[in-house]
Amino acid sequence: MTGSAADTHRCPHPKITKGTRSRSSHARPVSLATSGGSEEEDKDGGVLFHVNKSGFPIDSHTWERMWLHVAKVHPRGGEMVGAIRNAAFLAKPSIPQVPNYRLSMTIPDWLQAIQNYMKTLQYNHTGTQFFEIRKMRPLSGLMETAKEMTRESLPIKCLEAVILGIYLTNGQPSIERFPISFKTYFSGNYFHHVVLGIYCNGYYGSLGMSRRAELMDKPLTFRTLSDLVFDFEDSYKKYLHTVKKVKIGLYVPHEPHSFQPIEWKQLVLNVSKMLRADIRKELEKYARDMRMKILKPASAHSPTQVRSRGKSLSPRRRQASPPRRLGRRDKSPALTEKKVADLGTLNEVGYQIRI
C-alpha cells in the first residue's frame, strides 16, 4: 500500500544509503527546514509522503527533506540518521541484474523472475518516492521512467512497480497486463494501492510491491478475474482493512513507443455497497469484454457510453448501430451522467485540432 499509519515507525529501508551514488557531496546536517513544497507532497492513510521531482542525481533539497522525514519516523530518529550519514565507510550497495527472458522459461517462471527482481530492489520505506509517475503521461514516457528504475536500482513503491512490471513484460504478447486499484478503509483513514493484473492462457495473477506479502504478487492460478479480486479482498481482511472500491483498467498495449496513456479505471466497483454475487457478475462481464478486445479507452476523442447493469457488450448482443467507443463505467449505486465529448474540434479522420 502507498501508506499505512501502522507502519510509520518501521525501520527505514536498508537501501536508503543508495542516495550517495547520485549525490555524494551532500552536506550532512540532521536538523533541517521543512519542505513546504505542496506539489511534491501527497497523503495516503493520513501519512505524508514526498515525491522526487528533481530526477537524478537527486538535488540537495529533496535529499535533505528525505533524511528529515526518516529522522522523524524512525524509532532512533536523528541518532540513526547521523550514524549513517557521518559513517567513514559504507558498503557499496548491490545492483541486481535485470531479468532476461529465455525460450526455455515458462510464463509463470518468467513472471516469478520479474517479481524476484522487484523484491531485490525492495520496498521503499524512506517516505520519498524516488521516481515520479504521472498517470496520464504517455506510455512511451512511463517506459523511459521504468528504464531509469533499472539503472538506479533504488527501492520502489506500488505505483512504480506497476510501471516496471509493464516494462519488463513488454514483448510477450501472450501476457495481458492491466492495472487493479484498491481503496480501503482502516482506523479512520483511507488507503490506496495498485497492482498489475496479469492474464495468460486462461488464468489470472498479478505483479506488484507492498509492505504486505499478501497484497502484491499472486500466481497465475485464478480461473476468473473475480477470484483474483476476492483473494485480494480476503487478504485485506487479515489486516482489518475494508475494501471500499476496486478499479480495473484496460489491457496495456505491448507497444513501448505508444503515445496513448494507460487507462487506469475503466470499471469502478463500489464493492462495499454490493453483494459478492453482483461483484462477480460485473467483473466477469468486464473480463469477457476485455478478452474480446471490445473495450476502448475512455480518453479517445469520440462519444462515450456507459454500460447499464446487466447489459453485455459481446458481439452477439450488440445492436446493429455503428459501434461507439466506451467510456469509464462506474458501478456505484448512483451513476453520474456522462457528458458527450464536443466533436466541433475533430476533423474527418477523428483527430482533434488544437487551437
From Swiss-Prot:
GO molecular function: actin binding; metallocarboxypeptidase activity; microtubule binding; tubulin-tyrosine carboxypeptidase
Tissue: Preferentially expressed in bone marrow-derived mononuclear cells at the sprouting front.
Phenotype for residue 183 to E: No effect on tyrosine carboxypeptidase activity
Sections of the chain in a coiled coil: none
GO terms under biological process: axon development; cell-cell fusion; labyrinthine layer blood vessel development; labyrinthine layer development; placenta blood vessel development; positive regulation of angiogenesis; positive regulation of endothelial cell proliferation; proteolysis
Alphabetically ordered keywords of this record: Carboxypeptidase, Cytoplasm, Cytoskeleton, Hydrolase, Phosphoprotein, Protease, Secreted
Biased segments, Basic residues type: 11-26, 308-319
InterPro entries recorded: VASH1
Active-site residues, record numbering mapped to chain: 158, 193, 210
Catalytic reaction annotation: C-terminal L-alpha-aminoacyl-L-glutamyl-L-glutamyl-L-tyrosyl-[tubulin] + H2O = C-terminal L-alpha-aminoacyl-L-glutamyl-L-glutamyl-[tubulin] + L-tyrosine
Subunit structure: Interacts with SVBP; interaction enhances VASH2 tyrosine carboxypeptidase activity.
Effect of residue 210 to A: Strongly reduced tyrosine carboxypeptidase activity
Effect of residue 211 to E: Strongly reduced tyrosine carboxypeptidase activity
Family: Belongs to the transglutaminase-like superfamily. Vasohibin family.
Enzyme Commission number: 3.4.17.17
Positions of post-translational Phosphoserine modification: 302
Biological function: Tyrosine carboxypeptidase that removes the C-terminal tyrosine residue of alpha-tubulin, thereby regulating microtubule dynamics and function. Acts as an activator of angiogenesis: expressed in infiltrating mononuclear cells in the sprouting front to promote angiogenesis. Plays a role in axon formation.
Effect in UniProt of substituting residue 157 to E: Strongly reduced tyrosine carboxypeptidase activity
UniProt KW Secreted keyword: yes
Stored PANTHER family: TUBULINYL-TYR CARBOXYPEPTIDASE 2 (PTHR15750:SF4), VASOHIBIN-1-LIKE ISOFORM X2 (PTHR15750)
Protein name: Tubulinyl-Tyr carboxypeptidase 2
Impact reported for residue 218 to E: Strongly reduced tyrosine carboxypeptidase activity
A matching Pfam family: Vasohibin
Gene Ontology CC terms: cytoplasm; cytoskeleton; cytosol; extracellular region
Signal peptide range in chain numbering: none
